Amino acid sequence: MKIKILFATLLTLFLFTTGYAQTLDKAKLDLFFERLAEKKKAMGSLTIAKDDKVVYTRAIGYAQVDATAKKPLTAASRFRIASITKTFTAVMILQLVEEGKLKLTDTLDKFFPQVPNARKITIRQILSHRSGIPNVRRDQATWKPGAPVTKDEMLALIVKGAPEFEPDTKNSYSNSGYFLLGLILEKLTGKSYDQALEERINSKIGLKDTYIATGHIDVNKGEALTYINTGSDWKQSFETHPSIGFQLISTPGDMAKFIQSLFDLKLISQDSVNQMKTMRDDEGLGMVTFTFAGKTFYGNTGGGDNYGSWLAYQPEEKLVVAYTTNAKVHPVKDIVTGVIDIYYGKPFEIPAFQTIAVSPEVLDQYVGVYSNPEAPKKWTITRDGGTLFVQPGSENAAALEATAQDKFQLFGGRLVFEFDAAKNQMILKRGGRSIVFTKEK
C-alpha cells in the first residue's frame, strides 16, 4: 500500500513539474525586456496567461515621445493589432454560420456579384486566403497614407483588380478578402462592425479595450503612437488611416482573454474551433499555427506602420503569450521565441545587441537611391547623424545596424546590406540570396 501511495505521489509531482514552467524565471524575462529597452530594440507590451490567470506582464518604451515629455507604455496601453483583427472577424463569421444566417459554402456573388470570380469564391475560401482576390495595397490606391478612404472606394479597388488565381487552387494572403467579410458581417447583422464586435465578443467575455480604429491614434485614450528607431532616439512613424480596412485596437490583456475564451468555447462551438484550427497550406480560418519550444501554438500575427502583434495559444497547457509593439526593431518573432523559451526554461541567451560606429563621412558614401531593373522597388538610403536608414519604395524608413564599415543589417540580420562605394553598388542579402542594386545618378 505504501509503495502504491509513493508511486502516486511521485506521478503527481512528475505531471506537475513537466506541465507549467516549474518556476517562471521572471527575473530573466525582466532582463530580456530591459535589454530590449536599453538598446532601443523594441517598445511594447507583453502578457503571459496560464489557466485563465495572468502570470506575467511587462511594458517597455513609450506611447508618445515629443520634445517636452515621454509618456511610458503600461499594461493598459492600446495598440493597433493589424491582422489579428482577422481572427475576431473569422469568429463572428462562424457565429453567423452557427446561427444559420450564412454558410461556408455560400459564394461571394450573394453579396458582391461585381467582384471578379464572385460566383466561384466561397466564404470558406476567403477565410483561408484561397479566394484569389487580389490584395489591395496602399501604393495601388490614390489616397495618401494618412488620408481616409470610404468603403465604396475600397470596394471599387477590389472590383477593379484582376484575380490572382482561380479560387481554391492555391493560397495567397488577402487583406481585401477580409475587408469583404467585414462588409458581409455588417450586411447580415444590420450593425456596424464595431457594434457587432461589442455584442458578439466584447460583452460576452468582458473585453474593455478592444474596438475598431476609426481615426488617427489618440494618446488621450491610452493609444500608442508608432515609432522608428533613429539610432539616438525615437521618431514618430507615418500613420495609415484605418479606414482602408477593419482594423482593431486592443491590449495584450484583452487579446489573451479573447483567445482563451475562444478555446474555452465561450464564443463558438468546438466544431467551429476545429475548423479554424484545420490548416491547409499553413492557413486555417482566421488562424495559423506556430511551433515554439517544440510545442504547437495557435493564433495569429499582425503588422503595419511599424506596429507589430503576436498572439499564440498552447491548448493542452492553456498557455497564452500576447505581445504588441509600436516600434518594430528587433524581430517580433525573435522576441516571442525568447519569451516562450524563457517560460519553459529552455536555453536562451539574451542578445547583447553589439554594433560598431561608422563615421558620417563613410556613411555619406552610401547615401542615395538604389535600383535593379528586375526588383519591384527602389531602395533609398539616407543618413541622420551617425545612423544609416533604408526605405523600400514608399514604406517606412528603418534604421540600419552597422556590423562592419561597409556592412549593415536589419531585422536581427535577416536582411544584410553590403555597400561598395567605388562601384556605386549595394548588395542586398536575404535567406542565402543576393541581389545587386546600383546607385542612381
What are these regions (language model features)?
Residues 119-311:
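Short, surface-exposed loop or secondary-structure junction motifs
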